[in-house]
């Protein structure tokens, strides 16, 4: 879209930017400055088209879907101090069928993107609804995986086990 937008193309020229990727980083930097002035943190999606994020403040956290880091960008950004939120498609894309992202996978994933816990700010589930035809299907795909993810997010490493979660899930189902 930005390639076709006259205002975006004008902003690229006026600010001496190379392309639409630079425009996104320019825009996110402005948003980050504003949010920081109000006492908030910024989070943006790490996406495949970025080759270099050096112009982007390292205090903007990234959600990382784990589609691969062939260019070493995520590793470089970690070295710069960027915080990451794990939103790996396996197991945190809840629009994927249970055969791809099983309840056990969600429950037993440690949430870490690296060996150092402090580098991962948290975990996040995705529910892309373009292939979810109705609320019944949405609920089926989301629950109890969301409960397993929540238990996993605030639990000690290695807890809950899958069997422990299944035992606790009885109470969880009563709340639904």
Regions found by a protein language model. Name each.
Residues 1-62, 67-80:
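Active-site neighborhood of glycoside hydrolase catalytic domains
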Residues 49-58, 62-174:
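Conserved alpha/beta catalytic core and glycan-binding cleft of carbohydrate-active enzymes
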């Amino acid at each position: 879209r930005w390639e076709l937008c006259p205002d975006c193309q004008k902003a690229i020229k006026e600010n001496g930017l190379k392309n639409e990727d630079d425009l996104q980083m320019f825009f996110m930097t402005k948003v980050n400055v504003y949010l920081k002035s109000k006492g908030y943190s910024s989070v943006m999606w790490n996406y495949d088209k970025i080759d270099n994020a050096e112009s982007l403040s390292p205090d903007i956290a990234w959600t990382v879907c784990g589609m691969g880091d062939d260019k070493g960008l995520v590793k470089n950004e970690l070295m710069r101090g960027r915080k990451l939120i794990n939103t790996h498609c396996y197991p945190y894309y809840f629009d994927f069928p249970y055969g791809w992202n099983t309840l056990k996978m969600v429950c037993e994933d440690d949430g870490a993107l690296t060996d150092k816990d402090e580098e991962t700010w948290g975990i996040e589930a995705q529910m892309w609804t373009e292939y979810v035809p109705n609320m019944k299907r949405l609920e089926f795909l989301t629950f109890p995986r969301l409960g397993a993810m929540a238990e996993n997010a605030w639990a000690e490493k290695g807890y809950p086990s899958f069997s422990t979660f299944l035992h606790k899930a009885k109470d969880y189902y009563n709340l639904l």
